[in-house]
Design a protein with these regions (language model features):
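Polytopic transmembrane helical bundles with strong interfacial aromatic enrichment
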Residues: 1-149
Length: 149
């Protein structure tokens, strides 16, 4: 029962995180760029990240903790290689998330508060690059999950 609960929490966290990044990158970003100028668009992103990132911080902790527990519950030597790939790549994704949440997002928020639109735009561009990286890494994690079955 514990394994199923951990697996459920892991999958909910992963699907929320990847789905949120996918929506932001492929849907919200182009729509906001099409209809909003930087003085409206950049505060929208700042407010969106202020809601999304704390939720994803919880998801990242749940994903890593549940994944690590499941990995150790079968033993590192007995775990399929896909599990090791998932945890390793997921750990890299967590570091990338940490850079966004703890370093780049505060710059975006501060630049928006100061109405420094070029600098806020540069911070948003960096976040976009890091989200793109995490989307690619997330696809690798999903492929590893499929191969581990």
């Amino acid at each position: 029962m514990l394994r199923q609960t951990l697996l459920l929490l892991n999958l909910l966290g992963v699907s929320t995180w990847l789905g949120g990044m996918f929506f932001a990158y492929f849907c919200l970003r182009p729509a906001a760029a099409q209809v909003l100028q930087p003085p409206q668009r950049l505060p929208l992103w700042s407010a969106t990240f202020a809601r999304f990132l704390p939720l994803m911080a919880v998801a990242v902790v749940v994903i890593l903790a549940s994944g690590l527990h499941m990995l150790f519950s079968v033993g590192l030597g007995a775990a399929p290689i896909g599990w090791h790939v998932m945890f390793g790549v997921g750990s890299v994704m967590a570091v990338v998330f940490g850079v966004v949440y703890l370093w780049v997002f505060p710059r975006l928020k501060a630049r928006c508060a100061a109405s420094s639109w070029p600098e806020a735009g540069a911070a948003l561009h960096r976040i976009r690059q890091l989200v793109a990286l995490n989307l690619v890494l997330g696809a690798v994690v999903v492929a590893a999950a499929v191969s581990a079955r």
